[in-house]
Amino acid sequence: FSVGVALPIAPVTLHNYLADGDLVLVAANGGVNFYIGNNPESDGITAVVPGTRADRWGGQEDQVRIAREALGDDQATARQISEFWYDRGWKYILSDSMGAARHTAYKAFILINAHEVSNNRVIEFVTRHSQIYTLATLRFWVILPLATAGLVIGGGRRQLKSLLVIFLVVYSATLIPFFINARFRLPLAAILIIFAASAVVTWY
């Protein structure tokens, strides 16, 4: 199992080390994404660091500049920059634990909400102007209730169901601390559809 997990990741880690001289497992944007989801101005869905430009490359330059200025090191590595933003996120959480807890609960609500939060595509715009896309898209507000019913009344092997439920819980737990959008919760939908189908089969 460990070898199977390590094989696809190792080439990426090696590339990161050769390119930047820093041991980064896969990517070094976890810290900034954590701060985006855990700061006084976070709304749980907007993927922009407060005080930075909203466009992708401009925002990334600002994130690096702010971190390096605060660290007093204009050669700070990607890993050090990520650690800086993680630290700022944790400082917010520890300074306002109740507010952070309420915000985390709100992000959990967004995760199961019917609204599809756009990230790199404006989903509502596409569905308004494409009948094919509308008909071909099964919305989260349909999938989640059916999946819940499937978990309760559906058949299937208990061990397999348990593994799928564990995935749902663990993936959700790794997503909520950051910020929520439809693209990030898509892996949940893929598993929930299995349980939703189980409910439909049981009923019909």
Regions found by a protein language model. Give the residues of each.
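Membrane-proximal stem/loop segments at transmembrane-domain junctions that anchor or position
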Residues: 25-111, 115
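Hydrophobic/aromatic-rich transmembrane helices and adjacent perimembrane loops
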Residues: 7, 139, 165, 173-174, ...
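Membrane-interface junctions at the ends of membrane-embedded or membrane-associated helices
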Residues: 1, 153-161, 193-204
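Transmembrane-helix signature of polytopic, lipid-linked glycan biosynthesis machinery
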Residues: 10-14, 150-156, 167-184
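Membrane-interface anchor segments at the N-terminal boundary of transmembrane helices
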Residues: 91-164
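Hydrophobic alpha-helical membrane-interfacial segments at the cytosolic entry of transmembrane helices
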Residues: 1-17
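Central hydrophobic cores of alpha-helical transmembrane segments
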Residues: 1, 163-170
